[in-house]
């Protein structure tokens, strides 16, 4: 699409009319289409960084309100599911971003408009663009519009991270993970537990929770996240 492309249809899908459309244009600009110096500044990469954090904040608030009985470990797993690359790429497709991407000739010919990693990055960049143009409330409305259905009906069942970690260790010929208590703090009526999980030859991971079980799950999640392992089934 040319730079004079009328973005009215896209803005209608997003539910936001830009006061400064340059934010939207930048969010759709891949590094391959930028020439000269400071290419990373004039592509969506900085917006992607901001959008990742804005998206995480809004989705965290949504989860906190939607699941009042959920403990922090479950909320963290749900958050990871909702902001993972595949989910963001699906949102980008729902937004209809592909045809609007500004790509270099090589990327355009290689099918980049359908590439999951690029679509996921652009979805986050668009969140940031709306945030910069209309503030947190506008960004929240955008996230609500495209992520709410995924929050209420998760596409993938969530798995216990302790089970996933044990399977991961077994597949690598390692013994079962060992969980050890590190610290107990707080009053008796609201204790906090810090737990570490150990596997031979690997750095331990620590996490806190309101119970030992919650802390163990959080520690397992932290370990898996560090190793790049996803805890949802179907991977």
Swiss-Prot record:
GO annotation, cellular component aspect: cytoplasm
Pfam families, per the entry: dsrm, Ribonucleas_3_3
Residue span, DRBM domain: 160-229
InterPro entries cross-referenced by the UniProt entry: dsRBD_dom, RNase_III, RNase_III_dom, RNase_III_sf
Class of the enzyme per the UniProt entry, highest EC level: hydrolase
Job description of the protein: Digests double-stranded RNA. Involved in the processing of primary rRNA transcript to yield the immediate precursors to the large and small rRNAs (23S and 16S). Processes some mRNAs, and tRNAs when they are encoded in the rRNA operon. Processes pre-crRNA and tracrRNA of type II CRISPR loci if present in the organism.
Protein name listed in UniProt: Ribonuclease 3
Species name: Azorhizobium caulinodans (strain ATCC 43989 / DSM 5975 / JCM 20966 / LMG 6465 / NBRC 14845 / NCIMB 13405 / ORS 571)
Originating gene: rnc
